[in-house]
Swiss-Prot record:
Ligand binding (substrate): N168, R179, H186, F200, G201, E202, Y203, R213, Y292
Pfam families for the chain: Epimerase
Assembly and interaction partners: Homopentamer.
Catalyzed reaction equations: ADP-D-glycero-beta-D-manno-heptose = ADP-L-glycero-beta-D-manno-heptose
The organism of origin for this protein: Burkholderia mallei (strain ATCC 23344)
Entry-linked PANTHER family: ADP-L-GLYCERO-D-MANNO-HEPTOSE-6-EPIMERASE, NUCLEOSIDE-DIPHOSPHATE-SUGAR EPIMERASE
Alphabetized InterPro entries for the sequence: Epimerase_deHydtase (IPR001509), Heptose_epim (IPR011912), NAD(P)-bd_dom_sf (IPR036291)
Physiological role: Catalyzes the interconversion between ADP-D-glycero-beta-D-manno-heptose and ADP-L-glycero-beta-D-manno-heptose via an epimerization at carbon 6 of the heptose.
Protein name from the UniProt record: ADP-L-glycero-D-manno-heptose-6-epimerase
UniProt-annotated catalytic positions: Y139 (proton acceptor), K177 (proton acceptor)
GO MF annotation terms: ADP-glyceromanno-heptose 6-epimerase activity; NADP binding
Length: 330
């Protein structure tokens, strides 16, 4: 049976395609915005049946052009949290997603989709419930609105609907994301170019580099998606994070120490890295004040209750692995 991945040439989509390939799944229709031609590089080592532009996909899918489709992994979206064009964001992230959802419901196709922890905004609790949801930007709002649609249609749905609120994802195949790539990616490139990494200084009661996030490896993100793909009877909206909050300083020290290890140099503590000028703190930008999550930590209660019991990589494990992968791409 055919599988469809939207946003297939993007960061998470391409990793899902690769994970499906590793299980022997190759009857995959990859859907993406083909105006960004360079993104095809994420699929060069993947096996797919077809590669469609997003503008033609929904109509053809709704028409039944692809025969029996077992599942759609809907990862396609504008993920730029600094995008201010509300119409563009709503068209891409809300209306387009509704059209894909409607086609899946009509055909009895599993629908697994990307939600976002941006829905929680400045909340101090990250539980999949309406009272904790207060997005700070139009990206988060577009995801929030779609999750409200899901909550309304899920009770009557005859096929699986599984949404994943991704926390701070990092890992291979994100280089095309530019400024929205992970801090691990930017730290890697900064250190190679300048011999140091830069982090935000103190802000909102947090010390330099001490803003904390739930950093989750894209390897784990793909594994969770495939777990629910294998269990089509399980529906819901689930946090997808490690359940641990770690400071940006942990990312920086891991990047620096992994690169040092690759050059045969010993590991250093954060204090030693700062003292030697390998980690530098810059003033918090005015443009982000009031729109920035200083703390995120996924509540995994629902995810674990749904049967996902595998451990998640820590920053030290996942970022080390990622830096070695990036180094191998040079």
């Amino acid at each position: 049976m055919t599988l469809i991945v939207t946003g297939a040439a993007g960061f998470i989509g391409a990793n899902i395609v690769k994970a499906l390939n590793e299980r022997g799944e190759t009857r995959i229709i990859a859907v993406d915005n083909l105006t960004r031609a360079d993104k095809f590089k994420n699929l060069v080592d993947c096996e797919i049946d077809d590669y469609l532009d997003k503008t033609e996909f929904v109509e053809r899918f709704a028409r039944g052009d692809f025969g029996k489709v077992r599942a759609v992994f809907h990862e396609g979206a504008c993920s730029d949290t600094m995008e201010t064009d509300g119409r563009y964001m709503m068209d891409n992230n809300f209306r387009y997603s509704r059209a894909v959802l409607d086609a899946c419901l009509a055909q009895g196709t599993q629908f697994l989709y990307a939600s976002s922890a941006a829905i929680y905004g400045g909340s101090s609790r990250f539980v999949e419930a309406r009272e904790f949801e207060a997005p700070l930007n139009v990206y988060g709002y577009s995801k929030f609105l779609f999750d409200q649609v899901i909550r309304r249609v899920m009770p009557s749905a005859k096929s699986q609907i599984a949404g994943f609120r991704y926390f701070n994802v990092y890992g291979p195949r994100e280089s095309h994301k530019g400024r929205m790539a992970s801090v691990a990616f930017h730290n890697f490139n900064q250190f190679r170019a300048e011999g140091k990494v830069k982090l935000f200084g103190e802000y909102n009661g947090y010390g330099p580099g001490e803003q904390t996030r739930d950093f989750v490896s894209v390897e784990d993100v793909a594994k969770v998606n495939l777990h629910f793909f294998d269990h089509p009877q399980k529906s819901g909206i689930f946090n997808l994070g490690t359940g641990r909050a770690q400071p940006f300083n942990d990312i920086a020290t891991t990047v620096v120490n992994t690169l040092r290890a690759l050059e045969g140099q010993p590991a250093l503590t954060l204090a030693e890295q700062v003292e030697q000028g390998l980690v530098e703190y810059v003033p918090f930008p005015d443009a982000l004040r009031g729109k920035y999550q200083c703390f995120t930590q996924a509540d995994q209660t629902k995810l674990r209750a749904a049967g996902y019991d595998a451990p998640f990589l820590t920053v030290q494990e996942g970022v080390d692995r990622y830096v070695r992968w990036l180094f191998g791409q040079l």
